[in-house]
């Protein structure tokens, strides 16, 4: 299996399966002399960690990260810093329940990657989905924590802005509310609604989708390159690679199709601090290159495919059958996609910053 690496100069390779001994990543291309400890990474992992509320999978994983390489104590200050060599990060799996998946050993779960993995490779890890499990995203979050250290002047935040058909009231957006509810929702009133709404879905054994918005502030103008190195192209690819993501938009995205040229153009004025854009329909990127405005992206997460209703499928022999999914699953996988999205955007921005410095100094 290839394609486990993304990035050009800041490169991340993830490894491991949902029910294997461990998962992790190797980060290559991180500049030297950047302070980095396990505590710097653990905070981000704790935000993604499962089992923290009744609205996520009840799999109990501590997700304690270990730095295996790429750091050492600075010879003068004694502070632990990066050395410029590959940084290997490992997270042990401690709460696997593979017996929950014995029924699907020979059956394909509708909506999952079971059929496609076996069609491609002739074998699949049915225990929790193997590499296709959202468990893999913990490795991305660990890598994203390293990436944040490469771009300390940028603030990268994400929020759940819609669950099912119910969107937040953007007039009530408050970043401080993100940490006050289990949904990473910036609207206090809507978070209270989501609690009752998702409880109802969870108790029926069903699931629901979500929309996540990511905003990166402090991104300097000039990141990205024309044609095949566009910043928005790489962001879209990074976000689309997250489990269950089915659509990505930058800035106003698909809504711009309904706008006129006058409405959509981000007009510019001068100021003592440089150009000032009067709007940000483009989401901070024009021609594939950052404008200096906040970079804005949104993506849609489909409902978790593992639900408690019997469904029609086929077995490995091609016979029609029914399947009832067991195991521990998220009723809304979009919730834990929030810190994953931040991590992916951080990795892309770190990669583009290093590429930009290499090209133009």
UniProtKB/Swiss-Prot annotation:
Cofactor binding remark: Reduced FMN (FMNH(2)).
Domain of life: Bacteria
Pathway the protein takes part in: Metabolic intermediate biosynthesis; chorismate biosynthesis; chorismate from D-erythrose 4-phosphate and phosphoenolpyruvate: step 7/7
Keywords, sorted A to Z: Amino-acid biosynthesis, Aromatic amino acid biosynthesis, FAD, Flavoprotein, FMN, Lyase, NADP
Swiss-Prot/TrEMBL cofactor(s): FMNH2
Residues that, per the record, bind FMN: 131-133, 243-244, 287, 302-306, 328
Matches recorded under PROSITE patterns: CHORISMATE_SYNTHASE_1 (PS00787), CHORISMATE_SYNTHASE_2 (PS00788), CHORISMATE_SYNTHASE_3 (PS00789)
Positions with a binding annotation for NADP(+): 48, 54
InterPro entries xrefs: Chorismate_synth, Chorismate_synth_AroC_sf, Chorismate_synthase_CS
GO molecular function term, any single one: chorismate synthase activity
Reactions this protein catalyses: 5-O-(1-carboxyvinyl)-3-phosphoshikimate = chorismate + phosphate
GO CC, alphabetical: cytosol
Gene3D superfamilies linked: Chorismate synthase AroC
Function field: This reaction introduces a second double bond into the aromatic ring system.
Family in the record: Belongs to the chorismate synthase family.
Subunit structure: Homotetramer.
HAMAP family: Chorismate_synth (MF_00300)
Protein name: Chorismate synthase
Organism encoding this protein: Rhodopseudomonas palustris (strain BisA53)
